[in-house]
């Protein structure tokens, strides 16, 4: 089976191919003989009822510094593709949301992965609140009195922006923290939406587990251990990747989430688990494929394409 595939992503020249999951998906698609086109979100347009984009044919190579070749730009009706990979990174802003509205117009006749309507309606730090029984105590708010009441009840907390990503602007706030007032003011000026305040989990020092689900089924995992002098375990922030197995509790979390993800068309999802607590459900542009493979884990890119091909058969 040869599929016509388009990928909407950030500029390919800027990606770090060693850790980039989109690149892993493209390598696998190319190995299977699929025809790949590339475009950035700013090249997507709605002309009357037609969703079009200025795309370029794409060839990829697993060679740092020489990892891609692009063809000449061409304007294409997006309905002509079998599959579109929605893979640009957050911020989950109005530009991102608009692209999901446009791609929703071609789905499911053209299979968009992940389902753009579900991506739009499942922001990582809000969608997870559908599963509070699996989470640490969590508050979504920008009300100072509400936040202080939560801190008084739960002690040390983590405070982070609702639509942040990659570990940016994540802070631990101690029970009697003299910096809280300044931090509150900074967040109030910087972020218009509410923020996430979550009970601090000390076991994060032993790792924040990224678990990948493909079409609702467990596909692989990596434990991300923070640097000694940092709270954040994100690999882009210096976290170290380590091989791992799932605990019974983590398997229970996967079993609970799986059917909900599948029914929403969220085919490729990364969840974050600390000390048996679910903290985030990443649906926009999940990462971890290459780290899992590098540590001897399963070939998740192959699993994803197996599912995509089955849906297109």
Curated annotation (Swiss-Prot):
It holds the Pfam family GSH-S_N. It catalyses: gamma-L-glutamyl-L-cysteine + glycine + ATP = glutathione + ADP + phosphate + H(+). Residues 125-309 form the ATP-grasp domain. Keywords: ATP-binding, Glutathione biosynthesis, Ligase, Magnesium, Manganese, Metal-binding, Nucleotide-binding. Mg(2+) binds at residues 280, 282. Its cofactor is Mg(2+); Mn(2+). SUPFAM superfamilies: Glutathione synthetase ATP-binding domain-like, PreATP-grasp domain. The keyword Transit peptide does not apply. It comes from the Bacteria. Binds 1 Mg(2+) or Mn(2+) ion per subunit. InterPro entries: ATP-grasp (IPR011761), ATP_grasp_subdomain_1 (IPR013815), Glut_synth_pro (IPR006284), GSHS_ATP-bd (IPR004218), GSHS_N (IPR004215), PreATP-grasp_dom_sf (IPR016185). Pathway: Sulfur metabolism; glutathione biosynthesis; glutathione from L-cysteine and L-glutamate: step 2/2. Its EC number is 6.3.2.3. GO terms for molecular function: ATP binding; glutathione synthase activity; metal ion binding. GO terms for cellular component: cytoplasm. ATP binds at residues 151-207. Belongs to the prokaryotic GSH synthase family. PANTHER family: GLUTATHIONE SYNTHETASE, RIBOSOMAL PROTEIN S6 MODIFICATION PROTEIN. NCBIfam families: glut_syn, PRK05246.1. This is Glutathione synthetase. The gene is gshB.
């Amino acid at each position: 089976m040869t599929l016509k595939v388009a990928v909407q992503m950030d500029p390919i020249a800027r990606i770090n191919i060693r850790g980039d999951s989109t690149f892993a998906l493209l390598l696998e698609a190319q190995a299977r003989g699929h025809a790949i086109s590339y475009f950035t979100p700013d090249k997507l347009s709605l002309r009357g009822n037609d969703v079009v984009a200025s795309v370029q044919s794409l060839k990829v190579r697993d060679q740092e510094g020489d990892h891609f070749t692009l063809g000449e730009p061409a304007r294409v009706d997006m309905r002509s593709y079998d599959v579109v990979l929605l893979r640009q990174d957050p911020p989950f802003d109005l530009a991102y949301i608009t692209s999901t509205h446009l791609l929703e117009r071609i789905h499911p006749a053209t299979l968009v992965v992940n389902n753009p309507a579900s991506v739009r309606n499942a922001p990582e730090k809000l969608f997870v609140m559908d599963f509070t029984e699996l989470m640490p105590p969590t508050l979504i708010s920008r009300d100072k009195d509400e936040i202080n009441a939560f801190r008084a009840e739960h002690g040390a907390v983590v405070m982070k922006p609702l639509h942040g990503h990659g570990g940016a602007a994540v802070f631990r706030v101690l029970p009697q923290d003299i910096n809280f007032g300044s931090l509150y003011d900074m967040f109030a000026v910087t972020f218009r939406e509410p923020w996430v305040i979550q009970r601090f989990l000390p076991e994060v020092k032993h790792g924040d587990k990224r678990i990948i689900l493909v079409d609702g089924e467990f596909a692989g995992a990596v434990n991300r251990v923070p640097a000694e002098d940092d709270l954040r375990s994100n690999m882009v922030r210096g976290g170290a990747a380590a091989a791992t197995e799932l605990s019974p509790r983590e398997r229970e979390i996967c079993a609970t989430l799986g059917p909900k993800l599948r029914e929403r068309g969220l085919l490729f999802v990364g969840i974050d688990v600390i000390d048996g607590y679910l903290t985030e459900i990443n649906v926009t542009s999940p990462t971890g494929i290459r780290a899992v493979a590098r540590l001897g884990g399963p070939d998740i890119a192959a699993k994803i394409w197996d599912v995509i091909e089955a849906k297109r058969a």
